[in-house]
Amino acid sequence: MAGRGLISDEYQNVLCKMGEHIVYLDGLDQDSSWVIAREPLHSAADNYVIRRACGNASNAKTGKGPGLSFALKAHRLLKNASLIGPDFQIGLIPTAVGGSRIEYWRPGAVLFNRLIAQVRAGVRIASENGRNAKVRGILFYQGESDACQEDLAEYYRTFLQVSSR
């Protein structure tokens, strides 16, 4: 979900008009802070050093992904259904690493451990700022690196391990 889509000024202007309803955890671990969401969400999370450690040495530029559009739509639907108040915020914690294989997301693997650390940091930082943050869901999009997986049964076993945590 790291995203490689082009980011236009027009798209960023639309995001600015959305106000402070969507925020994201910008930075890694202790250096993180909650800020108004802008693309690219994954500029810190999806860096070259992390991709290289997972066997993807491409230097692809991070761009627009599906996370922010998903959050904007979710906020609109929840608000229209009167399930949230006018000041409710959705917080995104970007952890995607473009080009990573699902095996790096297994419980105990490097990216899984990093994901858990980021979520804990996000909840802690929100709490320190007087916010009552709760993890309510996860948007997991696994794609191209496992598209030609020969052993689909093993892929789905791994996916179930990742998604059941």
Stretches with model-predicted labels:
Residues 1-165:
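Cell-envelope and extracellular/periplasmic
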